[in-house]
């Protein structure tokens, strides 16, 4: 039995709100149950030094958690003067995920930065960030098309992410915080709209897991991502 | 004529939403027109080293701006590894303002941290932070009373803040970003519910200002703070 | 009764010594009683990146306190690896004050940095820094004129600063350390030679202050600045 | 055809040299072809603050790369003043992997730090670090047993790691640098001696990968880890 | 011929002014010609962690250079967020020199910090720091004796330092900046009042130097230190 | 009697292994008894900003110690976020020593960085670094000659370094760790192949030393360096 009474293969309620703030070229609030992440896309008309003159663009991501997004206050990274290893790991993951579905040459010599800031955390913030940031990225590229700066949107496919895990012996989809902090295996799967796997990160927190368990978990994740892609489509259609 | 068509003594629409997030002891979204700041209050049952064993509590504040809260993206302080001078100045101001209306001895040996994070900026973020943080602080203290940890709320009076300035030669109340970036004098006034001045910071961006101008500006601010205190009361009554 | 036996409207002895060190384009030791600040002006023939090619100059300030300028040794900021919020707040204030009285276009594409280093502290170091730095700035500009690099001194007016406050219930001018650490209200006022207000920063350390108190304090400050401007004139005439 | 002429399922030559340096409680040089990592285990008789008094030990890891371990010199992290996100990601991975096979309660209130320093890099440094660090950890625990500080070695099983990937369309085992920098999918698999999966991290550098490809890759990795575990056993028996 | 017209074995004018500032337990301005260093000694009634409970005290030093102590402004270390290698090297040298002549056991469990801040630089600032800091240290210990905290001054002997070098082929004593920046060999010698060598640091900036040259340089330094010790004695007697 | 049973004028066994790693232009493992330092030379085809366009090259050095190179683990500088003063002092020394024997103009506008990383420490790491780095530097320059980028090797002479000291009252050559941590005087001498002194750094850890002792120590060092230069020659001839 899951603490939230959800079925093993049931996602939390997903809500994707576009135009949550007004300055960014793409601005999306994504909610997965009580997890809420603000994802903004900012377009800059230049690229980082290592790409100058190479005729292609770049997509990168930064991730942050408001100090009191969590049950107990965590210290502010800006005040401590450095980002934790966890933060850096997550923002690298988000960047890789998004770059896997955009044609960087078609983007031209510009950079899009996705800022994913967690306003409230209840597990699964890195997956929600990827799913929400994709919408913000798509929106920002659309504005470049509308402004006549690009002939077509260079985003080639959807990308979304979901966590799965083994909780009290059973495989479950979309772990919330109570599950996440008490599970045996935790796996994040990033997939495209076409169903290709872009990234898989599975960790045994307790007992090692087996090939069979892994297979069931990826099945669950595939199901979850399919729902998330549908939610992205609805959000863009709205 | 103000860009927003407001009267010289007209505040922007003020909205104070309590319980905006669920983990913090106090959580308030304050909106002054398009400026939106999330203020959370976090209670910790200990005090910083310099106060240990002194039989009193402490109230402190931290301030941050999401990278794309502004028209163009500003770099993330956590990524740069340090807070700007502006950020430090603002968080020191918020802390002083709140400490002026709370009985720290009555609070006991605990610390309350107010995190003010700007989700969207359109001028006046430090004033909005003070006004919103006061509500979050009050709420957090109320919970301590409800939990039987304090006999009475140690917050003795309201405190709120507003900016005033001389824009195109005329004194105006509550500057928004277009006014703020093009005014001659910019003044932030922090006042209590009883009308006492807690802090005044006036800066001539262009021409120096006179005693008379200063007097008119403080009148306007007094009016503005009165409205803000009423908004705080409504929010608490809701 | 003031600890120093001064009258409420009496400044400490002001001494401004030019050419205190030999390398800087302007070098001034200012003493306000036991407070001693070394202010040097350094001219560089280029401007910071944000001003390049804009046809104007820049004036900026840095502030430091020697570790044992104070009663007990404070740790060295260079050793800790960062400047405190207080230091940053003060150096921003000094920079703004000086920029308010210089014609940056007339200065041309060069930068003048004012270093204000406190050799001995007895209250009022930020105000002494502004008053002393103005002399160093003027002197540095004069050398540019003498060297034929500028047709006329771009400094348009004096600027000086003084603290006022409410000590044991009475308004007093030019707080020294014993007063500063035990006063109800502390206000720093920056004014031009013509009497315009450039910056006012008032803080209630204890009880909030009233409009009437504020008015008396600004009167006292006006008086104080007038004396300081005279001291600046004497120093330049010497 | 692989650049190294190896068969798709062929590991590079593995060499594990114990007692490579003399001060550490465990000191192992692991070589996977031209990749060489020095892994040392250091025992300290206390635990980090978050574990004090909890009756258990801790195992953690740090990772570094000598500036010229690589084809072109990379800058020294100590000189830059911070570790890259990649470094932090790797050292977190090594720590998790090792903790998965040690009984931390049986270790008692002591910490073992595994330092993995890459002397020469040719791909697969994080996997080599895990495989080598396990030997150093085992050795350090053995010394605690010999010294009578522990009744039995708390390491419960082997753990080793290997990279697999899709290179020029074909699944291959143990990527070297030329393969790693030109592959479509790169996957690191951490497994125990009993064959359980502890961690799996797969990333599509180019095209997304399929369930079937993933399955073949995990088969290859299982084979590779089996060889590595045998190499660990030989090294301990030597 | 030396730029300053001095004889090869002639020191610059030495001036040691005690009580230059009022808060420190020892406060000395030392001038070697145009080089001016403020040396303060601060006594704290505890020792650094590595000495706690060992029944002895500690003497340490910090060194800084005001940004415009030099011909062209150098950037402020506090603003850059770190001390240069040169600064660290010098403060380590000053600390070692002073510790060589004090009985740390007799000092008891307290620490004396010597802050050496260069107000104006014209070569030889590290040597002047040592010579001046010794006087400040002696003075601070004397106050501990006068306060009844120590039975006798734990400083056992004088220590002073001087630079020597080979300038235009000739050995000279006490290099000033024009000589220092254009010499072949630069040597700093730290000696006790009894004539023992505490530290010698010689560097060939151009051609390597010979045993014979080294011998002549140490002779010159011995002479110089003898004069400096006399100056220290006069300062203490004043 | 020395702990190692060596004669007072006996070096530890010196071993210089070239091509210890494969990527660097010069790669040398130097062993002085149990002290082992990996020295690599990296050539870059540009110079640091302060030398651009000056028609000369630059040689610089960085130094590091693996955390468990020592008896007890020391913390990793990259993790702490800064290099110690000792590290900076050593790397500055290595750089100066090498620059003293290379014709920087003949090197052309390129920079060679010597990375000296201590794999195992038993005293004398800075001296071993200089002696080993010289071989790596020579080798890297040789490769530039072989590649036709330089007409001749710009290294003009050997340079090597050795420590000497007064241990239990007697002058000894090449201190190992047990001697180094218990000696009265410790001196590092850097000399050229021609016998010129490039750098001498002597420190009295206990009693000050005399002119006579200094003379004996330099004699010993001269002897030691002669052996080291021979070892460098053998290594290059191999």
UniProtKB/Swiss-Prot annotation, chains A, B, C, D, E, F:
GO BP term, example: tRNA processing
Molecular-function annotations in GO: 3'-5'-RNA exonuclease activity; tRNA binding; tRNA nucleotidyltransferase activity
Record-listed phosphate binding positions: 86, 124-126
Domain of life according to the entry: Bacteria
CDD domains to which the protein is assigned, alphabetical: RNase_PH_bact (cd11362)
UniProt catalytic activity: tRNA(n+1) + phosphate = tRNA(n) + a ribonucleoside 5'-diphosphate
Keyword field: Nucleotidyltransferase, RNA-binding, rRNA processing, Transferase, tRNA processing, tRNA-binding
A Pfam family assignment: RNase_PH_C
UniProt xrefs under InterPro entries: ExoRNase_PH_dom1, ExoRNase_PH_dom2, ExoRNase_PH_dom2_sf, PNPase/RNase_PH_dom_sf, Ribosomal_Su5_D2-typ_SF, RNase_PH, RNase_PH_bac-type, RNase_PH_CS
Database matches in Gene3D superfamilies: GHMP Kinase, N-terminal domain
Enzyme class name: transferase
EC number(s) given by UniProt: 2.7.7.56
Protein family (similarity comment): Belongs to the RNase PH family.
Assembly and oligomerization: Homohexameric ring arranged as a trimer of dimers.
Biological role stated in the UniProt entry: Phosphorolytic 3'-5' exoribonuclease that plays an important role in tRNA 3'-end maturation. Removes nucleotide residues following the 3'-CCA terminus of tRNAs; can also add nucleotides to the ends of RNA molecules by using nucleoside diphosphates as substrates, but this may not be physiologically important. Probably plays a role in initiation of 16S rRNA degradation (leading to ribosome degradation) during starvation.
Listed PANTHER family: EXOSOME COMPLEX COMPONENT, EXOSOME COMPLEX COMPONENT RRP41
Protein name: Ribonuclease PH
Originating organism: Dechloromonas aromatica (strain RCB)
Species classification: Bacteria, Pseudomonadati, Pseudomonadota, Betaproteobacteria, Rhodocyclales
């Amino acid at each position: 039995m899951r603490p939230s009474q959800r079925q093993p293969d049931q996602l939390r309620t997903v809500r994707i709100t576009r135009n949550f703030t007004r300055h960014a070229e793409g601005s999306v609030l994504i909610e997965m149950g009580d997890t809420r992440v603000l994802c903004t896309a900012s377009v800059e008309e230049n690229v980082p030094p290592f790409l100058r003159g190479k005729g292609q663009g770049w997509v990168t991501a930064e991730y942050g958690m408001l100090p009191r997004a969590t049950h107990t206050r965590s210290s502010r990274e800006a005040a401590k003067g450095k980002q934790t290893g966890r933060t850096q790991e997550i923002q690298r993951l988000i960047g890789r995920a998004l770059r896997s579905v955009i044609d960087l040459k078609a983007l031209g010599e510009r950079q899009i930065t996705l800022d994913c800031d967690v306003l409230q955390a209840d597990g699964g913030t890195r997956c929600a960030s990827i799913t929400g940031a994709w919408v913000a990225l798509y929106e920002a590229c659309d504005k470049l098309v509308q402004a006549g700066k690009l002939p077509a949107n260079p985003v080639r496919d959807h990308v979304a992410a979901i966590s799965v895990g083994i909780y009290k012996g059973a495989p479950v989809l979309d772990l919330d915080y109570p599950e996440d902090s008490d599970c045996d295996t935790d796996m994040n799967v990033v997939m495209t709209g076409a169903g290709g796997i872009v990234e898989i990160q599975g960790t045994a927190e307790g007992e090692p897991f087996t090939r069979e368990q892994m297979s069931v978990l990826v099945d669950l994740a595939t199901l979850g991502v399919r729902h998330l892609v549908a939610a992205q489509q609805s959000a863009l259609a709205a």
